[in-house]
Amino acid sequence: MSLGSELFRDVAIVFSQEEWQWLAPAQRDLYRDVMLETYSNLVSLGLAVSKPDVISFLEQGKEPWMVERVVSGGLCPVLESRYDTKELFPKQHVYEVESPQWEIMESLTSYGLECSSFQDDWECRNQFDRQQGNPDRHFHQMIIRHEEMPTFDQHASLTFYQKIHTREKPFGYNKCRKDFWQKELLINHQGIYTNEKPYKCKECGKAFKYGSRLIQHENIHSGKKPYECKECGKAFNSGSNFIQHQRVHTGEKPYECKDCEKAFSRSSQLIEHQRTHTGEKPYQCKECGKAFNRISHLKVHYRIHTGEKPYACKECGKTFSHRSQLIQHQTVHTGRKLYECKECGKAFNQGSTLIRHQRIHTGEKPYECKVCGKAFRVSSQLKQHQRIHTGEKPYQCKVCGRAFKRVSHLTVHYRIHTGEKPYECKECGKAFSHCSQLIHHQVIHTEKKPYEYKECEKTLSHDSTTVQPQRMHNRETHVNIINVEKPSISSYPLLIIREFMLASNHMNGSNGESPLA
């Protein structure tokens, strides 16, 4: 057996008929990709590999045990009786071996490996001759499953064919009581139950369960990209990535969601999408326990805890934890905005941002709270809102342990410990930790007192101080003021004012919990 054929047999992933029936369509497609990729890798490495029947089947889109060529003249009576009584699996098929493998079958005949009735029942042998109509071109019939299918080679082990015809399966696995013809098939099957990874990369030490994965991984170190797209010239280091890329040009989306009929070009995209229906979040942060439906989201989230910022701007050196943040920042240097709103002309550097912006014009609010029915334009707003019902506070201060519902609130709070004051007054140079504090300070320079209390017409510089004079006139707890002259500060978002309230409560030693926490 050639080195290539032996390696393919060693690394090929094999499923029995029973296992195949349990696989989902996406998993079957993944199996096809891996098997075809394994064979392509061996060929690209210059190893002589005679194409196995299973590869031919997969290339034609057939199931691994699809009949390649049905015997027209019937079966040997012994095999036919086994087939009719369903002693064998119903989807097992007959394979005929003829020239140029005739020399092999000739040697098998000399060892008495033909149908067992051939030794004593010459009528059975004559029936074979009559089937083919040519006594000089004998065919040897075997009923075998995909996992038992041999690659006929003049140097193949005679014992292997004996085991096929006698249906002997000497390699058993105690965990599932399954038996196999070959030791390699047993090893592959054991990989389903164990985490053993026998194939190790010599460059970086990374280990893999299957040899085909190692071959694909080694292309990363060598820089080899043997799969090139004829449409655009883009090259890939794995056959599966190449196949997925081709769907960009063809528009093919073979993976469809049964719940909403949305289609995808990759099986992994469908699996991730289905979690939006099931609510499954299998990836959990070890630091704070927050769970995600995609591992990429977990990796990005984890940078909050590690402080990692892997994306650096080449222009100014500023670093970011998200790639999208870097792209957005780069527009400061380029001034380029790719996505423009047709309604108002506002431009954005990300398509997703434009989509969210357009909902302002359409009024669309696709994200609805299941508890109270409130709807939101952006999914992140819904997540923040849901914490009102759940009481979840995923963002915790490492210094004092205080927890917050929003990461922006944690960022503002953390300045109490660091002493950071990023907001500076241009008039006097005084610095503040909160933007809202700077806004209130600037009133001193403008000498504006825009808030008037209607009972005594006393004017104040900001509305929080109206509470005290109000209590002089009545016992009501509600603030009753008239905004006489709205300064520019009214344009600042409510969040800034709420941040100031949070800081004020903390600095005043309030024991009550802030509504923001």
Curated annotation (Swiss-Prot):
Principal place of residence: nucleus
A single GO molecular function term of this UniProt record = RNA polymerase II transcription regulatory region sequence-specific DNA binding
Residue ranges of the KRAB domain?
Answer: 6-77
Q: From the Swiss-Prot or TrEMBL record, give the protein name.
A: Zinc finger protein 582
Which Pfam families would you find in this protein's record? KRAB, zf-C2H2
Matching entries from InterPro entries are given as: KRAB (IPR001909), KRAB_dom_sf (IPR036051), Znf_C2H2_sf (IPR036236), Znf_C2H2_type (IPR013087)
Keyword vocabulary terms for this entry: DNA-binding, Metal-binding, Nucleus, Repeat, Transcription, Transcription regulation, Zinc, Zinc-finger
Q: Write down the superkingdom of origin.
A: Eukaryota
PROSITE patterns, alphabetically?
Answer: KRAB (PS50805), ZINC_FINGER_C2H2_1 (PS00028), ZINC_FINGER_C2H2_2 (PS50157)
Q: Which GO terms describe its cellular component?
A: nucleus
Biological process terms in GO annotation? regulation of transcription by RNA polymerase II
- Protein family per UniProt: Belongs to the krueppel C2H2-type zinc-finger protein family.
Q: Where in the cell is it found?
A: Nucleus
Q: What is the effect of changing residue 65 to G?
A: Found in a patient with mild intellectual disability and eye movement disorder; uncertain significance
- Taxonomic lineage of this organism? Eukaryota, Metazoa, Chordata, Craniata, Vertebrata
